[in-house]
Amino acid sequence: MPQISRQEYAGLFGPTTGDKIRLGDTNLFIEIEKDLRGYGEESVYGGGKSLRDGMGANNNLTRDNGVLDLVITNVTIVDARLGVIKADVGIRDGKIAGIGKSGNPGVMDGVTQGMVVGVSTDAISGEHLILTAAGIDSHIHLISPQQAYHALSNGVATFFGGGIGPTDGTNGTTVTPGPWNIRQMLRSIEGLPVNVGILGKGNSYGRGPLLEQAIAGVVGYKVHEDWGATANALRHALRMADEVDIQVSVHTDSLNECGYVEDTIDAFEGRTIHTFHTEGAGGGHAPDIIRVASQTNVLPSSTNPTLPYGVNSQAELFDMIMVCHNLNPNVPADVSFAESRVRPETIAAENVLHDMGVISMFSSDSQAMGRVGENWLRILQTADAMKAARGKLPEDAAGNDNFRVLRYVAKITINPAITQGVSHVIGSVEVGKMADLVLWDPRFFGAKPKMVIKGGMINWAAMGDPNASLPTPQPVFYRPMFGAMGKTLQDTCVTFVSQAALDDGVKEKAGLDRQVIAVKNCRTISKRDLVRNDQTPNIEVDPETFAVKVDGVHATCEPIATASMNQRYFFG
């Protein structure tokens, strides 16, 4: 077989096994672990290339014969479950149909089952791109619908959260309370080009108010201190969640009015729960809520304002807290409440615990102390800062950072999918799942996606002047694409609900046109099910200094003065 140099091959078909890719301007390098395509018969679109009639594209088989709708050729996949691999990705009926070698089995060897390219197939050239699952943000305050556009512009295509717009309750808590509000929000999100699951109010001792929200369509209960995060409220929310198989998320009691962190852990009664603000800067038992991350039944997340820990993190938190939680700077008790959350020691420990795989998920807390359009960016910045502070992870190979990168990718893809009961639909690049995918230029990985594929259609992309002679001339903006338009939006986006709501006919009763899918397996999971982030060490917090020890070792880092992928990526 004729041979070419590795450099020439990479120029034609992109990197292959053993090649390394730098991510943005970080010091993070991934290495392709395996290539599923084979060499010599690569599928390539374009003039004089292989995906032409009778060559790589079959000219006899119809779509009814299983031909792909879309193929992404020669792309580098970065996925928490698959690893870092090179492959073609086939899409059909809005789902991932195959990962491997695409083409025409009539003239090509080794074409993967279900990955035939034909007349019905369009192509995206992935030769010099990275493909990930689209991000999932599990901590959304539904304050403004425009959040969806900013999230898509950073590669996030699924929201879990609550609210009804800019009410004070929504500004402070991720809650859509009661059946009427839930119904209206289900109808409103029909026009959003992202998947959405709504959280109801879990602060109730009564069974009735909890059950009616599950039947109305929520995918979980949120117990928030602003509504009273008492032990009894937690117990009742968890019991009802067990009954209807939905998740419970908690923002615990910062003031320790109703008990301490030990009392809250006791109220969990060993049942599965998603803890928001596990670090405590965004709220929760002061100063030691971070201890819950050691519990096997706790699925811990934290939010992006303190990730990575920077020299300005502490200063900006105070004003955030005052605004979000309706506090008065002229009331000493309100000021003390805000100040109790701002603890540099626990913020530093939060960063370290993410790097160790102890805090398992990463979310935004959109417009309520966090930035909805910065999740992927903050994840890569944090991973890079932790490599600089802590060195290579023991799990990483000598020449790459694959494990660390995949650990952080899991925090915004598969782990929130598992936690919210939707990993059978989204969260990873796996055959059979909805084709919610993001393509990145490696130079902008984590900062600026090239395009977002939603349910098999491109619904968001960096696009040049629509009046230009090419797609590329400036000004290049993120713009909605055809997948986010008309009735296709409903076909390519999902509204997640409880099984109780689906059984009650919520789709018909609320007049929903989108796909409506029930969450499942929310109550039988534990931290052991979370990918690459399942560690449960002993965590202690000094009540005087707030120093955090993990298995007896002080967990801390210095705040960074500069971050990767920062000002040089964002002018203005």
Curated annotation (Swiss-Prot):
Active-site residues per Swiss-Prot or TrEMBL entry: H325
Binding annotation for Ni(2+) 1: H139, H141, K222, D365
Annotated Gene Ontology cellular component terms: cytoplasm
Subcellular location: Cytoplasm
This protein's pathway: Nitrogen metabolism; urea degradation; CO(2) and NH(3) from urea (urease route): step 1/1
Gene3D superfamilies to which the protein is assigned, alphabetical: Metal-dependent hydrolases, Urease, subunit C, domain 1
SS bond list: none
EC number, as in UniProt: 3.5.1.5
Positions that bind Ni(2+) 2: K222, H251, H277
InterPro entries, sorted: Amidohydro-rel, Metal-dep_hydrolase_composite, Metal_Hydrolase, Urease_alpha_N_dom, Urease_alpha_subunit, Urease_AS, Urease_asu, Urease_asu_c
PTM notes: Carboxylation allows a single lysine to coordinate two nickel ions.
Highest taxon listed in the record's lineage: Bacteria
Keyword set, alphabetical order: Cytoplasm, Hydrolase, Metal-binding, Nickel
Reactions catalysed, as given in the entry: urea + 2 H2O + H(+) = hydrogencarbonate + 2 NH4(+)
Similarity comment: Belongs to the metallo-dependent hydrolases superfamily. Urease alpha subunit family.
Name under which the protein is recorded: Urease subunit alpha
